[in-house]
């Protein structure tokens, strides 16, 4: 009988974000297919994605009693604790997501004969934003057995010795988004979904919508998500006297159901990897507008004017013009949405999960 393969996954926490959702989806797929899966997170937070009960969850952070005043000593304790986890669990492969977790996965598993795959989920220069982190990423990743990147542009950040072991793997998308495209009269809503922080730049979208709100009085802008900037944006909406036209309901679990009949989906981010929310909206056949941001995720998905609209980063005026154009051209909006729905063909779960499975198995 073939030995049950054991996959360990490492991430900071399972709070609601794109990378976390991808990893939770992967864990669910592998454990349901008969793999043994251990999810190692540094923390356990409120408002996390639910994890399949068959997945073993381990918290790797040091306890309050173990925490001292020295940051260096605390790092050493975290390092040793994570290394002990690898020694005890003996996974066949470690899959790490995001930033410093990737470095810790490589360092703590040294000489344990456990293959490591690290995944950069955003623009590398944003994830490794200091000269030291940049240097460490470029050198340490050469010691990984596999490197997973989001777009071709990401390859430029790394030296040849990293690029030669790097691959692009698509994001696994929840089955709930794969449904027949809605062909009826659409709700007069423009929607955005994502963490409410500076990088997502919902402020630009709010200000752009404010410029056309009077021209299109039937339309509302709805931004779904939580984050540190939510109170500030609610204040801005109040200042603009648009509290009845721009809504921020917070985080939701049933995204597919809620945005299914929406007129336009907007991604206003300053930087992105390959955005789950954009893929999900396109799969369901929404008309999409997205910033042409680094590291090129939206541009990899959208053929401008065919299956969506690409708009310049941090350009409120262009965002306004693109929304205005679409709301004045409903036939074009419908055409873009129909073409966007064709994206579903390349993101079928059986295809995407199969690519991840094949890659991880190739490392063992």
Predicted regions and their residues:
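Conserved acidic donor-binding segment of nucleotide-sugar-dependent glycosyltransferases
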Residues: 303-305, 309-316, 325-330
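Short hydrophobic beta-strand element within catalytic cores of glycosyltransferases
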Residues: 287-292
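A short, well-ordered alpha-helix in the C-terminal region of glycosyltransferases
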Residues: 318, 325, 332-346, 355-358
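N-terminal strand-loop element at the rim of the active site
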Residues: 9-17, 21-25, 29-73, 157-159, ...
